UniProtKB/Swiss-Prot annotation:
The organism's place on the tree of life at top rank: Bacteria
Name of the featured protein: dTTP/UTP pyrophosphatase
Function as written in the Swiss-Prot or TrEMBL entry: Nucleoside triphosphate pyrophosphatase that hydrolyzes dTTP and UTP. May have a dual role in cell division arrest and in preventing the incorporation of modified nucleotides into cellular nucleic acids.
Location within or outside the cell: Cytoplasm
Cofactor(s) listed: a divalent metal cation
Any Pfam family hit: Maf
Main location per the UniProt record: cytoplasm
InterPro entries, alphabetized: ITPase-like_fam, Maf-like
GO biological processes: nucleotide metabolic process
Organism for this UniProt entry: Protochlamydia amoebophila (strain UWE25)
Active site positions, chain numbering: 69 (proton acceptor)
Length: 194
């Protein structure tokens, strides 16, 4: 039995590598556009992460699968991964000076059960000029990040305040993952690295 991280995200891999838990990273073949947003961000991220898990279950029928999906959400609007630098610019402009929420759905399953939980983190951006947004975009590859930004590194220049789990904004909330893994008998505490 293997543990499969069903994600192409280097940040999720980085977070899981905080622990000595052996895993393989496999990109799910799943079109996120096929899941409609029904107005509830919690249900939406859970549906997305479940879809990723389902897309891998046939390939790994007896293994433990970990999948996650993250969105940025503000006043009824979902900000996913931007399709262009221009869209990322507009996202950052719209988020600048305002609070928004980052939701991540976590799905952990084995051949017998599926555990799902979500995490919400509230983020307040600094007010940003167009020039500051352009400078930020010159340093950050935005295409694979919900909302077109990241919390780590240069993200500290655009984020004024954060309420909740920092690692949720990176894409994999550690405590939520710990709770899901414990439901299938894996104690993440036993895999702490020195």
């Amino acid at each position: 039995m293997k543990i499969i991280l069903g994600s192409q995200s280097p940040r999720r891999k980085e977070i899981l590598n905080f622990f000595s838990l052996p895993f393989e990273q496999v990109s799910p073949v799943f079109d996120e556009e096929t899941v409609p947003f029904g107005g509830n961000p919690e249900h939406y991220v859970l549906s997305l992460s479940a879809g990723k898990t389902k897309s891998l279950r046939y390939q790994f029928p007896k293994d433990i699968l970990i999948s996650a999906d993250t969105i940025v959400y503000k006043e009824g609007k979902v900000f996913g991964k931007p399709r262009s630098k221009e869209e990322a610019f507009q996202n950052l402009r719209e988020l600048a000076g305002h609070w928004h929420s980052v939701y991540t759905g976590v799905n952990v399953s084995n051949e017998n059960q599926e555990i799902q939980q979500f995490e919400e983190t509230k983020v307040l951006f600094n007010s940003l000029t167009d020039d500051e947004i352009h400078q930020y975009q010159e340093k950050i590859h935005c295409a694979d990040k919900a909302g077109g930004y990241m919390v780590q590194g240069a993200g500290s220049l655009i984020i004024k305040k954060l309420e909740g789990c920092y690692y949720n904004v990176m894409g994999l909330p550690i405590n939520t993952l710990r709770l899901c893994l414990s439901e299938i008998g894996i104690d993440l505490w036993k895999y702490l690295k020195d």
